[in-house]
UniProtKB/Swiss-Prot annotation:
Reaction catalysis annotation: UDP-N-acetyl-alpha-D-muramate + L-alanine + ATP = UDP-N-acetyl-alpha-D-muramoyl-L-alanine + ADP + phosphate + H(+)
Highest taxon of source: Bacteria
Gene: murC
Organism: Bordetella pertussis (strain Tohama I / ATCC BAA-589 / NCTC 13251)
Protein family according to the UniProt entry: Belongs to the MurCDEF family.
GO BP of this protein: cell division; cell wall organization; peptidoglycan biosynthetic process; regulation of cell shape
Lineage: Bacteria, Pseudomonadati, Pseudomonadota, Betaproteobacteria, Burkholderiales
Name of this protein: UDP-N-acetylmuramate--L-alanine ligase
Binding site for ATP: 112-118
């Protein structure tokens, strides 16, 4: 990719998708600068790597850049974008830059409404264990690598493919995974599920004729698009007809044990005994996708088993903060704290089911910050249903993510609906800054507290730890 452009500037470099691309380009020898509205652990790390990082957006930040990269979170009237356009500096969408990176290697792209980050991480980990030394760009921090991106020396690059803005249609992988298709980010698709499915079909059609589509057989919407996928398909899941199928699945604390039966067309491969260092059936499916990729690429079974058993997880995906003391005023004892990024009812239900499977005799308490008013509105009844499945609920105001408030879909409305449903009495905490103390006021000995959401609630577990 070496050419006349040597300096690339990232507007919003602290974002998970942006920071990974910036890091890989830096390791390829480019001069990288970036700006973000807020300082964070991500921006500090990028600065330590050698990037020039500015906090705040200013026209002067683009000086000397040959191109600037933006995400969909960056508005068109951003001063750095305006300065670049005025100076005829190319303004490149994040997905287009990711597509350019993928042209350097053989791309494996992971798409789907839920499970992308974990599945991408599992694929990268299994390929690394198999000696393929992949490059990866992930939407979360891979714990074993301490980063969400790495430049490998092998021929493969593993990336997350983002359907939220349809930008995954810029990518040209040789292998494409689709974990599931669910109604989320529907503004992009005109609130038309058929258009959403068509986008996923188009995503698979961008594979070359020798490419491979790895599709989850357990998802009804994925099954519906299969007849329209014209590339070779490998199916995976718990369904008996899946080519890569998990059987005899058992939960063992926060680990899962299962047997994988594999069929390569008409050839039956040896069964694979797997111990996965993640909880929940949803993670069994994520692991099956990685096994399907690894099997197709010839990774040794022993390496697959080793990688899955030793997998250390991804930041904010069922991250266990450990056991903390219950205040003496509430009887003392300990409670277990878990942090999770889930913000859609389907993701939340899967995580809560995993928690129940891991700790079947304990009370599951959910501390949740809804993310976006439009999602809360569109999935309102589903949120009420999944929140009602917890034994205790602490609910904050909606994290707006730039949206205007909707009174009928705010935190209070959700709390009222949950109370009327009668399954659980919620504690409404309007200010998320007060949530850590509210959690400590609520917990009792033996509780498992799952802190969940995609917004500012991410700071809560550390604050609970400090207060406890």
């Amino acid at each position: 990719m070496k050419h006349r452009i040597q300096h690339i500037h990232f507007v919003g470099v602290g974002g998970s998708g942006m920071s990974g691309i910036a890091e890989v380009l830096l390791n390829l020898g480019y001069t990288i600068s970036g700006s973000d509205l807020n300082e964070s652990a991500v921006t500090r790390r990028l600065a330590e790597l050698g990037m020039r990082i500015a906090i705040g957006h200013d026209r002067a930040n683009v000086a000397g850049a040959g191109a600037i990269v933006t995400s969909t979170a960056v508005a068109g009237d951003n001063p750095e974008v305006l300065a670049a356009r005025a100076a005829r500096i190319p303004v490149v969408p994040r997905a287009v830059m990711l597509a350019e990176l993928m042209r350097l290697k053989r791309g494996i792209a992971v798409a789907g409404t839920h499970g992308k980050t974990t599945t991408t991480s599992l694929v990268a980990s299994v390929l690394a264990a198999g000696g393929l030394d992949p490059t990866f760009v992930i939407g979360g921090r891979l714990t074993s690598a301490g980063a969400n991106a790495r430049l490998g020396q092998g021929e493969y690059i593993v990336v997350e493919a983002d359907e939220s803005d349809a930008s995954f249609l810029n990518l040209l992988p040789v292998m494409a995974i689709v974990t599931n298709i669910d109604a989320d980010h529907m503004d992009t698709y005109g609130h038309d599920v058929a258009r959403l499915k068509s986008a996923f079909i188009e995503f698979t059609q961008r594979l070359p004729f020798y490419g491979s589509a790895i599709l989850c057989a357990d998802d009804a919407n994925v099954r519906e698009i299969m007849p329209f996928v014209s590339r070779p398909i490998t199916t995976y899941g718990l369904s008996p007809d899946a080519q890569v199928c998990a059987q005899d699945v058992q939960a063992d604390g926060t680990r899962m044990r299962f047997t994988v039966q594999r069929r390569d067309r008409d050839v039956v491969l040896p069964a694979l005994q797997v111990e996965l260092n993640l909880p929940g059936l949803h993670n069994v499916r994520n692991a099956l996708a990685a096994i399907a990729v690894a099997t197709e690429l010839g990774v040794d079974d022993a390496a697959i088993r080793e990688a899955l058993a030793a997998f250390k997880g991804v930041g904010r995906r069922f991250t266990q903060w450990g056991d903390l003391p219950v205040p003496a005023a509430h009887g003392g004892g300990i409670f277990t704290l878990v942090d999770d990024y889930g913000h859609h009812p389907v993701e939340m239900a899967a995580t809560l089911a995993a928690a129940r499977g891991a700790w079947p005799q304990r009370r599951i308490v959910l501390a949740f910050q809804p993310h976006r008013y439009t999602r809360t509105r569109d999935c309102f009844e589903d949120f009420v249903r999944v929140l009602g499945s917890a034994d205790g609920v602490l609910l904050t105001e909606v994290y707006a993510a730039g949206e205007a408030p909707l009174v009928a879909a705010d935190g209070r409305a959700l709390s009222r609906a949950l109370r009327v449903a009668g399954k659980v009495e919620p504690v409404f905490v309007e200010d998320v800054g007060e949530l850590p103390q509210a959690i400590l006021d609520f917990v009792r000995d033996g509780d498992v507290v799952v802190v969940m959401g995609a917004g500012s609630i991410s700071k809560t577990p550390a604050l609970v730890g400090e207060l406890a």
